[in-house]
C-alpha cells in the first residue's frame, strides 16, 4: 500500500482566512524547485497538486490591548497555580509529595535537549497548556511517518519509573561513618586478601565449637565484602565486635568471641597491604593498638555484664536528651586530668568515663604555680628577667621606646634604654678644649678615660707583657692580653663576648720560656728550628742525610734568595755587647714573619775569620758562615795574621782557611760540617810546628809504571807535569 507524504499534499484552503491588512500568508502560493534557486521569466499559471505549502507562522500581538490582556491572564494563571499548591500541602503528612511548583521550562525546544529524567515528579504527564489568546491555526499531525525525535525521552522515562521500584543498596550502619558518597569508587579487597581473611580469620571462628551462636555474623562477611561494605580489615574488625552483643547470651561468651576475633585479625594483618588493612586516616595496626583494643573489650564486657544483671541501666545513669555534656577539670584548672561529665537538670554531674558522681564544688589541688597562670600571664617571665615588681602595670612591662627623634628602637629593660640613649647624648666630654671630643663626647666614662690615656696623657699607663723578656707594651690592657694569647699561648678569659663564637685552641695552657738574661755567649744559646715544616722536601730514600733547603738555611742563619729586602750586612760584635743588646728580645716567636721583622733571630753573633779568601779561589761562590747546631762548649780559636797569599795546597800556608763550594752540594755524600767551632774552620797545621822537621815529602822518587803491571812500556805520566808552579821545592830536603 502506497500513499503520498501528508506534508506534500495540497493544503485545504478555507474562505475568510486572508487578513485584510495583508499580514497573513497566501496559502495558494506554491513553491517550486526551479523558482527557489532561479528567477523564472514568467510566473507559473497553475499549481500542481503535490506542491508543498508551509504552515502559517505565529505572530506576536500587534495591538497594545492584546499585550496587556495577555499579561493579566498570565498573572491570573500563576496565582491560581499557587493556590492549588497550597491547598494540597499538609503539615501533618510525613510522606514525601512531589513538588507542585516545579519549573520545567527550557530556553530551547524540549524535543532537542531533553535530559534523562531522574526525578519521578517530572515524569508525570503535563496537563494541556491553556492558551493565553486565540492563535492562528497550526496544523499538527501525528502519523506513522514521524521522524522519531523524542523517542529516547519516552524510553528514558520508562526506565526512570522502573528504577523507583528497585531497592537502593545502603551502607552498613557499622561502616557508614567511614563511608562517603564515593563508596562505589573505593577499591574493594583483592582476591588474595579475601582468601587470607577467609583462611586466618573466618575459618578459625567457624571451627571453634563454643562460638556457634556467632556463626551467622561470620557467614555474612563474604556478602558484605562483595557489596563493598567491608573494604579493609578494620571494617571486618568493627563488624565482628559491634555485632557480637546482639548474639551474645553472656558477657563471658562475648569476651571469648571478641578476643578470639582480635587474635585472628592480628594474625591476618601481616598478609595484607597497608591499603587493605585500614582506611585512609585510620590508626594503623600496631602492637599498642591491639593492647588498647583488648582493654576496651574488657571494659565493654564488664558494662555488658552489669546490664545483664540489673536488666537495665541504673536510674542515675539514665541518659536524658536535655543533659549537658561539659569538659571538666584539667591540670591547669584543678591539678587533675580533664574528663567529660554529664550534668543533669538537678545539677548532678556524672563522669562519662567511670559513671561516678563528680563533686564540682571541690576546691582545686593547691599548686605552687599552675600552668594556666604561666600561659595566661606571659609577662611574668619578662618581669622576673627585668627584676620588676610583681604587681607592675602593663605600661611598665611594655617595651620602652627611645625618645630621640627619628630613632625607632625599643628595649624591654629600662637599663638597656638608658644605655642606648647615652649614645645620642654622649654626656662624657673630653677635658681638652681643642679636642673634637670636647663637644662630641663619649657614651661611657670608660671610653673617655681610654681616649685621654691614648691621646692626651703625658705619662700614659702602659701594660707590659708578662712573659719576660718580651718587650711588648700597650696602652690598652685588652691589646696586651690579646698579644699574650697569640704570641705566648696565654689563656685569655673574656668576661663578655661580642656574639662571635670563639675558635677552639689546642694547648691553651701558657708555655713558659726560660729567660736568657744570664747567657753571655752565643754558643750557649740553643738553636730553634722553624716551626712550620718545609713544603719541598727531598726524597729520604735518595738522600737520607741531606736536609731540605728551608731547614738548612734556617738552621745556619742564611736567608733564601727570594728575600731581597733583608739587610745581609755583618757586624763584628763582641760577645759581651751582643749579649747585653739582645736581652730584650724573646728567644723565639710563633709568628710567620718573625725572620724578616727581627734584627737577629736567636740573639747570637757571628765570628768571622781575619781574612776571607777571594771569590776566584772558591769558584766565584762563598758558603755562608755556619752557626752552631749542637750545644757544645768549645774554646774560641785565635786567628793568626796571614803573612802570605792563601792557597789551597795541603803543603802551603799553615793557617789557610778551607771552604766547600756550594756548587758541589748536589754531589755531596752527606758529610756536613756541623762540628765547626764558632763559625771558624779548623787549622790544618798548628802555628808553632816546624814543617821542615816533622812533615816529609810525599815521594822521594817519581813512581814508575813497572809495578807489577803487564804493560812495561807505558810512558811516565808524571814527567808531563810542571811541578815548578806548585811551589814543590820548599818541601824537598
From Swiss-Prot:
Residues 1-11, 132-142 have a biased composition (Basic residues). Residues 148-158, 503-515 have a biased composition (Polar residues). Residues 39-49, 171-183, 519-530 have a biased composition (Low complexity). Keywords: Activator, DNA-binding, Metal-binding, Nucleus, Repeat, Transcription, Transcription regulation, Zinc, Zinc-finger. The keyword GTP-binding does not apply. The keyword Zinc-finger applies. It is found in: Nucleus. SMART domains: ZnF_C2H2. A zinc finger (C2H2-type) spans 400-424, 428-456, 463-488. GO terms for cellular component: nucleus. InterPro entries: Zinc_finger_trans_reg, Znf_C2H2_type. One of its GO terms (molecular function) is DNA binding. Residues 1-22, 34-63, 89-183, 497-533 are annotated as: Disordered. GO terms for biological process: regulation of transcription by RNA polymerase II. Its main location: nucleus. Binds to the promoter of the cbh1 gene and activates transcription. This is Zinc finger transcription factor ace1. It comes from Hypocrea jecorina. The gene is ace1.
